[in-house]
Design a protein with these regions (language model features):
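Protein kinase-like catalytic domain
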Residues: 10, 63-64
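Conserved hydrophobic core/spine positions of the Hanks-type protein kinase catalytic domain
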Residues: 58-62
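C-lobe/activation-segment region of protein kinase-like
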Residues: 64-69, 80-122
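Hydrophobic residue at the +6 position relative to the catalytic HRD Asp in the kinase catalytic loop
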Residues: 72-77
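Polybasic, positively charged surfaces/segments
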Residues: 29-33, 48-55, 66, 80, ...
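Structural motif at the C-terminus of the N-lobe alphaC helix and the adjacent alphaC-beta4 loop
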Residues: 4-15
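ATP-binding glycine-rich loop module of kinase domains
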Residues: 1
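Conserved structural core of kinase catalytic domains
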Residues: 16-53
Length: 122
């Protein structure tokens, strides 16, 4: 599934780590390592860059018309050299209740929702 999702997201134009190798019989993939803390880790320390939200919204502008959502939880994003990378390859057919505006945005600041999720998933 991740290989299919990678191809979908790559064609849409979502910034992703490069897929380096696939071991289909064992269902393993090797992808480029994007160095740096996740957006979730940075938010917990009080750091939030407006450009990150702008870049997620730009991703949404590509995803929604193509009929897709990604997992907008901030552990899936790493900023590096001015680019916000979506480091998970997962995507799902678009459903408004799971889009960024209705679900993901609640986790993109130091909200009770983010802190509760982080406490439950250390």
């Amino acid at each position: 599934a991740e290989l299919r999702d990678y191809e979908i997201l790559r064609k849409i134009g979502i910034p992703l780590p490069q897929l380096l190798a696939v071991d289909a019989p064992h269902e393993r993939i090797l992808k480029e390592y994007i160095d740096g803390p996740t957006v979730a880790a940075l938010i917990k320390t009080g750091r939030m860059e407006p450009a990150w939200l702008e870049q997620v919204q730009a991703m949404c502008a590509l995803l929604y018309p193509a009929g897709w959502n990604i997992d907008y939880y901030p552990t899936n994003f790493v900023p590096q050299n001015g680019t916000l990378y979506y480091i998970d390859y997962e995507c799902n057919p678009y459903q408004p209740e799971w889009d960024f505006e209705h679900w993901g945005v609640q986790y993109w600041s130091k909200t009770d929702a983010l802190l509760a999720y982080a406490a439950a998933h250390p």
